[in-house]
Amino acid sequence: KEFISWEGTNRELESWNMLYSQMASDMNVTTNLWEGLLSFDCYGKAVPSVAKEWSHNEDSSVWTFNLRDDVDWVDVNGEVKAHLTSKDFLVGLEWVLNAAKNQANNTSMPNETLVGAADYYQKTSDMGDAAADLTYEDMLAAGVGVEATDDYTLVFTCKNPCPYFDTVAAYTSFYPVSEDLITELGIEGFRACDYTNMWYNGPYVVEEFISQNTKSYIPNPNYFGADDVSRFDRFTVTMISDGTVTFQLYQNRELDEMDVGESTLTTIQADPNSEYNQQLCEKRPKKFSYQMHFNYQKNNEDGTPDDNWNKAIANTAFRQCFYKGLELTNWYARTNKINPLKCENDYYTMPGVCYNTQGQEYSTLVAKEMGFDKEAYDGKTMIRLRANNGDIADLKKQAMDELSAIGVTFPVHAAYYIIAANSTALDNATVLKQCFTDSFGDDFIVLDI
């Protein structure tokens, strides 16, 4: 079986190095090629990968991972290059924590959780280029909270009780790498490795890569989990510059799946006899959340402070108008026209990212703190607008009175930047602009695209 998917050209891969990259667009590729300690199931719960089982002590400060003994590294041709052991995770962690090697990328999770990790990172930073000569043995000698008690057992010691550490250890900061590969490529060479010279331990290897065009994967013939999963004979990702052409490609059988935008869905549903009505299905939410972040020190294009915006956004009542009054259903419909409010997420993380030791999903705990724990999707009203039914008349008056008194003029203009020459991005932004108009009134806040 072959499968053809797609990705936007603005999300082309920039780095093949799993330890170095911090881009989700890179990890969409490399997670098909590299395996770490754990993976996640379709519900966001941690499941075995290279680690077949794991446990922790009573206060969740010490975590033990037992590894499989049948994992090999292969090259781009699927030829076995080395056997994977616990040492490879030590080498990988030292690479991440070494400022001379990984240039501070992906350090936050180990630095925040592991004993001695932040100190070791600082040591390598202070050493400058000389730190490139350090090895995983130097990391262990420095007291970083990790040890390989044998070839297939890893033990991590956290600075504090960390009941969610298994989800942390699943992140790229803790991925393995073979010391032999780093020796073969050198520090600079490994940091800049690509699909032709990197080693793989995941389900696929790369058959072909043409930047901004296509990338094709074929099964890794020596994948340790081959008997446990189903794989495509070839999996191809086509890069598309404008999402408006995906439906045409799907109709031409040049794509096997596509995201159906609002306009395309309207076209399909307008014809009850359309064959595509039977092919519609709701897409599973991704683990990534999307937020609006306020800039509290915005500058104008000439570099001078945008005092009008900066004063406005510093006002509590002004900000609360966004929280309690911005109605986004029509904007969500650009992603999910049938059930737009399923796109609502009122938390920093997405549901399913992590669970505590009692099996409670993290965002449910946040919902309780925010007073949302009794609320549920109803398909009619955004959860955060239910308390006041989106009525911000009093807040708006308060904000305008307080801000007028300190010289703010109205409407306040909020800048919203999009990708140039991308018609889909422009259409989405235009709908968002109308949401601002409907929610705030153009006498109060105007969205500038």
Model-derived features with residue positions:
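Short, well-ordered beta-strand elements
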Residues: 1-10, 61-66, 89-92, 154, ...
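N-terminal lobe/hinge region of extracytoplasmic solute-binding protein
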Residues: 6-58, 199
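Surface-exposed binding/hinge segments that line
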Residues: 88, 95-182
